[in-house]
Amino acid sequence: VKADKIRTNTLSLKSSFDFNEAETRKRLIDAELRSEGWDVALDNESTEQVSKEYEVDGQPTTTGKGRCDYVLWDDNGKPLAVIEAKRTRKDANAGREQAKLYADALEASTGQRPVIFYTNGYEIYIWDDAQGYAPRLIFGYYSKDSLQYLILQREIKKDLNSTPIDTKVAGRLYQMESISRICERFSDKHRKALIVQATGTGKTRVSIALAKRLLDAGWAKRILFLCDRKELRKQAGNAFNEHTKEPLFIKGKSKKELASKARIVIATYPGMIQNYEEYDVGHFDLIVADESHRSIYNKYGELFKYFDALQVGLTATPVEMISRSTSQLFGCDYKMPTANYPLEQAIEEKNLVPFKVVTHTTQFLRDGIKASELTDEQIAELEDQGIDPNTLDFDAKQVDKAIFNKDTNRAII
């Protein structure tokens, strides 16, 4: 798995190389910032976008001054982020309080609180304390565009629970309850949720209504919808087009030039895994993962580790059959999803009809094949195919063995 290999490799490098703070900045942090489009000077100089060793006041030093390792600037001269670096062998968390002091100083001097990053070059933490989030480990740095939106959210975010649900899209009681539970969880500063809904009860509709609510409330600018097959990708694309007016990009189908303007991206897991690193870690604000089960975790779990977004898993797998890994991936205790609407309840409330198992067989499977019992039409058909009907004399067990052999069963399974 690519993301896991990268993380494992960097952590193994940590044990092999002991870079001091200056080397950590030059060899690791500078390179990662450049990869996200930041204009970083090759030496210790500063650029309009990235200041190094930026002096601030109000520090607990004899002079009252301190130097921020990095400050990332917006076009308006306001700080978007501050980065505190430690040498590679130190715990990244050792820089947490120092980073906060620098953020306090920048807020006091500019009127805008920057997003906080602290790192040892290998482990990177983001701390968006202005929005009430606790620090969390992330895979890389945000691009300028993603940081700008993170800052903007402080002004435009509305209360999710007071933002109406589009009941034309998801108006059934259990659908609205699922959306409300997710939004309550997000409002409580959790970043992941898992919905269990029986097949046919409208998981895609819940996804669309949830996406619209987060877009309307300023909680999301760009949304990624993941599914496991091209047929589902097409269905989801049609459904989003029908119920939203947002610019849509269907990965593997839409023209590539539409990708940069899209607010909703729909992709299969295999399609997204090929080139997800084209996006920075903060590009998407919400990821909705359809058909979330163990195989998705095993094959595509890196997508959820790479992107620093709110994440919602959707599955029709009954609660008692959901794996621990799936529950953990979406931040839920084992067998305790955020919302659950099982098949039995859907049938009881007449939102689904009970299924019936119908067993079909054929005369040949029941009675075998005997020339004396063939119709004139069957005899004529066999003769047209060059088969002598008189050679056919098989009992039911022989027919079953010939048709339902082990290889056939394996192919069906």
Question: Where do the language-model regions lie?
Answer:
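Short glycine-/polar-rich loops that comprise or flank the Walker A/P-loop
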Residues: K78-L80, T110-P114, W219-K221, H283-F284, ...
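ATP-dependent helicase/translocase motor core
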Residues: V1-R222, C227, E231-E246, S260-I264, ...
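Interdomain helical connector at the RecA1-RecA2 junction of SF1/SF2 helicase-like NTPases
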Residues: R324-I413
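Amphipathic alpha-helical transducer elements in NTP-driven molecular machines
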Residues: A92-K100, I266, L286, R294-Y297, ...
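Short acidic low-complexity segments
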Residues: F249-A259
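Conserved nucleotide-binding/hydrolysis micro-motifs of P-loop NTPases
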Residues: T88-K90, Y122-Y125, K230-L232, P270-I273, ...
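Phosphate- and divalent-cation-binding pockets in alpha/beta enzyme and binding domains
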Residues: Q235, Q274-N275, K299, I322
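SF2 helicase catalytic motif II
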Residues: Y279-G313, T317-P318
